[in-house]
Each structure stands twice: as C-alpha cells, then as structure tokens.
Amino acid sequence: MIPGEIITKSTEVEINNHHPETVIEVENTGDRPIQVGSHFHFYEANAALDFEREMAYGKHLDIPAGAAVRFEPGDKKEVQLVEYAGKRKIFGFRGMVNGPIDESRVYRPTDENDEYAGVYGDNGDENVNKKGGKRS
C-alpha cells in the first residue's frame, strides 16, 4: 500500500442509487453559455434556462460531484434530477429557499413501476412520463 492510496472495487460506482429521478427538458434562451454544477439547486438555476421550474424544486443534477452540465445559447436537452438528501436544507444560490425544503412542493412520480405516472399539469391535459418530464 502507498500512503494516501485509495483502493476501490473494480466494479462501477453507482451514484444516487435508489433516489427517484425526474427528467426535464431544458432550453437556454439566453445569448451566453450557462453551466450548472452538480450540487446547484436546479430550481434556482439561471433565469435564461427555460424549463418547468416547479418540477426541479428540492433537486440537483444526477451527475458526479464536481461535474457540470453546459447549455450553449439555443441548446435544448434533457437532464436528470434527484432530490437533495441529508438535512434537506438549502441556503444561498439565488436566495429563493434559504432554509428547509418545503416538502409539499417537491414533485414525486406516483408509481415508478407504471408505464406512466398519471401525473397531470395544472390544467389536466399535460401528461408527464414516469421520470417526471413532459411527454412529447
């Protein structure tokens, strides 16, 4: 063994295992690239990013710690989000929460095993898929 050496299993490391995912489509409507880091409260991401913000409340990107997703101007892509764990308190970012997560606002699919979760938008005609994103 070498001092400071970390010996890991030869299998892949799973991150956010057993955390329900929410997939949303995001578009950069701004004129500059936007990068969002792994632990950033996605609900509070740059206002030039167009997406269903309420579905991102209490969640961050499902990517390795220290990584980020970059959105070039006009880019449209799907991202996968997971809920914050631990004490579930959010401070800083854009100052929109600054305290405990309001659990009543956190979107959760109703049944991960169904083909569709049966969750509808405010007007009742906006179907979403089991991962929480809009159906096309």
UniProtKB/Swiss-Prot annotation:
UniProt entry keywords in alphabetical sequence: Cytoplasm, Hydrolase
Pathway as given in its UniProt record: Nitrogen metabolism; urea degradation; CO(2) and NH(3) from urea (urease route): step 1/1
SUPFAM superfamilies hit by this protein: Urease, beta-subunit
Its EC number(s): 3.5.1.5
Domain of life: Bacteria
Location in the cell: Cytoplasm
Pfam families membership: Urease_beta
CDD domains recorded: Urease_beta
Family statement: Belongs to the urease beta subunit family.
Protein name: Urease subunit beta
Source organism of this protein record: Staphylococcus aureus (strain bovine RF122 / ET3-1)
